[in-house]
């Protein structure tokens, strides 16, 4: 059992307030730092840290002292793939409820996808997102803007970047037109920003609902072949080869074949990155039999070989980061037959404990796993976060690495509860989330 509390981020910590974090195991994945020590913040910045920071005692001028009780103090997590449904589908999620869920999961920065209603393809909608974030968020809100407008012409990418877009995607749908994609890649290279693709050939997926394979055959359902993903990955990488300084990112990669193509592109020196969701390296198509529509997402859960390939991709570095594809849906959209239920699951409050299974079962070193959740996603979107460094923004979390608990969707801060991980026993609990020096979430474990 645990008691949770939240506080809105607003403008972050008061500029002159100093906070000392003591008795911490400080981990910074980028520098491979893993020490016992203390850390000092002032306002929204990290001032200093180290094993001997308060060797002569804590100065009386410190405004607040937080005892980490030998738990881990690490950079706040960064999730570059969330759907907060605002504007247009606020009955499923809002920036307020989604960011509240993120804070509970130790995520201090999220990137909202642009498939809202209307899409983030205009400056007006982009400014609305920024306004709502300032009014109602618990964490940092970034956003991708749309590659295309409703008429399939390119968005004004330069203008949208100017008002804050950290990249461009049509996520939820692929950019099917190869010429449009080539133009988008070309323009993005001039803007020094990332193009992120939902890799799916709609002609091949053909309105399928789960992975094409033994389970789809058993259930008599139309399947989505894995080649529907890899064929778009292959096409887009071919398109980018003659464009200088272009960065292409594949969202929620799910197939072994896609990883083979990505590995080859990286070996050729192309700037190709990709992400994987926790559900794609934890579950398979067989989980459909247990969880039904709660295990329906796009791309679909695939085979055990694909799942193991995702883990190998994380271990080898072919996969750059973990992202949730947090896709909230109300109960009416999910409690339907598999062929008509909505795609997607929520994931913000389970991302860290599910990912930590790879550490607890001996698959990945802790510091390598945490890299995929902190500075690596930060670098994809070019934001100066995800690190513990002097003068860096104080986005931090305190993690009880070994605390065991059971996922309970009724306790989720998200408006929606569509998760296949309900009742799963996990290990690793976020005790405090600090954004710009300000505590926005606390969990008090009640024994």
Swiss-Prot record:
Q: Does the keyword Ribonucleoprotein apply?
A: no
User: What SUPFAM superfamilies does UniProt report for this protein, alphabetically?
Assistant: Composite domain of metallo-dependent hydrolases, Metallo-dependent hydrolases
Cofactor binding description: Binds 2 Zn(2+) ions per subunit.
Identify the keywords attached in UniProt to this record, alphabetized: Hydrolase, Metal-binding, Pyrimidine biosynthesis, Zinc
Which residue positions are annotated as catalytic? 325
Q: Which GO terms describe its biological process?
A: 'de novo' UMP biosynthetic process; purine nucleobase catabolic process
Give the transmembrane region(s): none
- Its Enzyme Commission number(s) read 3.5.2.3
Instruction: Spell out the coiled coil positions from the record.
Output: none
Q: What molecular function terms (GO) are annotated for this protein?
A: allantoinase activity; dihydroorotase activity; zinc ion binding
Where substrate binds, per the record, is at 83-85, 115, 298, 329, 343-344
Q: Name one GO cellular component term.
A: cytoplasm
Per UniProt, Zn(2+) 2 binds at 171, 198, 252
What are its cofactors?
Zn(2+)
Where Zn(2+) 1 binds, per the record, is at 81, 83, 171, 325
Q: Which reaction does it catalyse?
A: (S)-dihydroorotate + H2O = N-carbamoyl-L-aspartate + H(+)
The pathway that the record names for this protein is:
Pyrimidine metabolism; UMP biosynthesis via de novo pathway; (S)-dihydroorotate from bicarbonate: step 3/3
Q: Which domain of life is it from?
A: Bacteria
Q: What does this protein do?
A: Catalyzes the reversible cyclization of carbamoyl aspartate to dihydroorotate.
Q: Which NCBIfam families match?
A: pyrC_multi
Checking PANTHER family in the record gives: ALLANTOINASE (PTHR43668:SF2)
Q: What is the similarity comment for this entry? A: Belongs to the metallo-dependent hydrolases superfamily. DHOase family. Class I DHOase subfamily.
The protein's name in its UniProt record: Dihydroorotase
The source organism is: Ehrlichia chaffeensis (strain ATCC CRL-10679 / Arkansas)
Lineage of origin? Bacteria, Pseudomonadati, Pseudomonadota, Alphaproteobacteria, Rickettsiales
């Amino acid at each position: 059992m645990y008691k949770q509390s939240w506080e809105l981020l607003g403008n972050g910590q008061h500029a002159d307030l100093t906070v000392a974090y003591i008795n911490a195991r400080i981990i910074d994945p980028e520098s491979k730092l893993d020490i016992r020590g203390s850390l000092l913040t002032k306002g929204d910045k990290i001032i200093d840290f180290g094993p001997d920071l308060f060797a002569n005692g804590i100065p009386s001028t410190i405004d607040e002292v937080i005892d980490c009780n030998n738990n881990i103090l690490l950079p706040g997590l960064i999730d570059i793939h969330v759907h907060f449904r605002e504007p247009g589908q606020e009955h499923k999620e809002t920036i307020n409820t989604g960011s509240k869920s993120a804070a509970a999961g130790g995520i201090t920065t999220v990137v909202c996808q642009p498939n809202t209603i209307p899409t983030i393809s205009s400056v007006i909608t982009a400014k609305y997102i920024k306004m709502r974030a300032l009014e109602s968020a618990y964490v940092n809100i970034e956003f991708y803007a749309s590659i295309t407008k409703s008429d399939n012409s390119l968005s004004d990418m330069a203008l949208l970047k100017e008002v804050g877009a950290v990249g461009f995607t049509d996520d939820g749908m692929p950019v099917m037109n190869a010429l449009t994609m080539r133009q988008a890649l070309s323009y993005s290279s001039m803007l020094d920003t990332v193009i992120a693709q939902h890799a799916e050939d709609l002609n091949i997926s053909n309105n399928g609902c789960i992975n094409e394979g033994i389970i789809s055959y058993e259930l008599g359902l139309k399947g989505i072949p894995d080649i529907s993903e890899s064929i778009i990955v292959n096409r887009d990488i071919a398109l980018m080869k003659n464009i200088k300084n272009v960065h292409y990112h594949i969202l929620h990669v799910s197939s072994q074949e896609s990883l083979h193509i990505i590995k080859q592109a990286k070996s050729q020196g192309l700037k190709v990155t990709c992400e994987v969701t926790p559900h794609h390296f934890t579950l398979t198509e067989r989980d459909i039999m247990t969880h039904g529509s709660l295990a329906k997402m796009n791309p679909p859960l695939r085979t055990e070989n694909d799942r193991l390939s995702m883990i190998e991709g994380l271990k080898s570095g072919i996969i750059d980061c973990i992202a949730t594809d947090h896709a909230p849906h109300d109960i009416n959209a999910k409690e339907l037959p598999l062929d008509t239920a909505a795609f997607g699951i929520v994931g913000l409050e389970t991302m860290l404990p599910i990912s930590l299974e790879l550490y607890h079962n001996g698959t990945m070193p802790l510091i390598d796993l945490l890299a995929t959740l902190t500075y690596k996603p930060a670098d994809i979107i070019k934001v100066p976060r995800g690190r513990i460094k002097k003068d860096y923004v104080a986005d931090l979390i305190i993690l009880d690495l070994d605390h065991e608990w059971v996922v309970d969707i009724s306790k989720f801060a998200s408006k929606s509860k569509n998760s296949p991980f309900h009742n799963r026993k996990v290990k690793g609990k976020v005790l405090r989330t600090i954004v710009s020096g300000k505590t926005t979430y606390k969990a008090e474990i009640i024994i």
